[in-house]
Structure formats: structure tokens, C-alpha cells
Amino acid sequence: QGVSSAASDLYKRQVHRRMGGQLEIAVFDKTASNPQARIAEAIARFARHAPEVALSVHVASISAIERGIIDGRFHVGVIPTHRNSQSLAYADLFGETMLLYCGRQHALFGQPHDALSWERLRDYPFAGLAHHSPNMELSHRANLTRKATGSDEEAIALLILSGQFLGFLPDHYASRFEQQGQMQAIAPERFHYTCRFVSVLRKSPQPTRATQLFQDCLMAVHPDAIR
């Protein structure tokens, strides 16, 4: 144990001495409120190991994050899984549950939902994300009646709150609207889907030491990830 501790201390000293510059991290919308996401813990861990590295955190869409990783603007990304790019390396981190919601002024609010089916949902205007994502894949697969699009989940929430549209949101994000009586989950045991979130790195050139260290921190704080 003494040898292991000494080796760990030596590693930390080397990291502190040699690692500097800036690390650009990009994450998908509304991850901070997800109890399964421990990105803040990864940031804390990284900051302890590499205090001289300046951190810059961005929130962006899946496609913008992947493009940014490929062109070198971002070093590490965290996104929901969708379709993989051959230029990128992905590693599983955590999950998220998406439920279907309506706003307080919607016809389905406060009504029984037992008779609702995916087919019946097509009678109601749907608001979905504008970019390729698990949200878009599901709405196409279920043939929902898309009448509005949002660039991110904040936009979807506004559309749902209008009372004119149904839409999917992360359960952890929508819970505060539910508690305030502004939204209702519609038959959550039936109308839901789950998605996995992954870290994203560029395959070539090889990640910088700071990038690899942050990736290691992400993996360390998500022990339940699918390996």
C-alpha cells in the first residue's frame, strides 16, 4: 500500500508540474440536474489533480458537440447516444429517463390517460428537438404529429408550458414544473424512453494529457457505467 501511495503521489506531482493550458468541455442540455450524472464530481477531481489547467465548459447540441470535438474546438464531450461517428471514441457514463408531458392548459392535463395509445397520441400536436437525437428518433418511429421544434430542452419546456403541445423532457428537469402544477407526465409507465450518455473524444490525433485525465475522471466517478 505504501508503494502504491507513493506512486500515486508521484503521479500527482508530475501532473501538477507539467500540465497547463486550457481544457474545453462540452456537455448536452440539462445534465446538471440529473442525479445519475456526476460531471461536477469529475470536474472537482480533475481540478485537484491539475490545478494549473483552466477549464471552459460549454452547453451545446449533440451535433455541435461532435463537430466541435472533430475540429478540435472542444476536447471532451458528454452527449446522449444516437449514431456514432467513425472519427470519435465513445465511452458509456450514465442514463436518463425521458417522460411525455403536457402543460396545465392542455386538453390532457388532469384527465385519465388509461385509454391513450401511441396511435391516439398522434391526435395531439407534438414538440420535438430539431436535431438528430434519441428524441427525434422516437418521434419518427412513433409517427408523432410534430408541429413545433425546439433547439434544446429549455425550448421544449416552453412549448409544453404553452399548453399547445406534448413533448418529452428528462424526468429530473421536469419535476419542478410538476411540483408547481404546471406540467403533468402522461401515463409515464407507458410513454417513456431511456437514453445513455457517453463521453466523446477525438480518435486522432491522440488526446492531450489533460484531455485523457479528464476522461479518466469521468470514468472514475461513474462506476455503474456499461463497460
Where on the chain are the PLM-derived regions?
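C-terminal regulatory
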Residues: 90-164, 169-192, 212, 219-227
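Short beta-strand-centered segments that line the small-molecule binding cleft or hinge
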Residues: 42-45, 63-98
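Short helices/loops that flank or line small-molecule/ion binding pockets
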Residues: 58, 63-74, 153-164
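N-terminal winged-helix
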Residues: 18-49
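Short, well-ordered beta-strand segments
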Residues: 22-29, 77, 127, 167, ...
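Residues at or immediately flanking beta-strands
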Residues: 22-24, 50-56, 196
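Single conserved hydrophobic/aromatic residue that forms the stacking wall/gate
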Residues: 1-7, 11
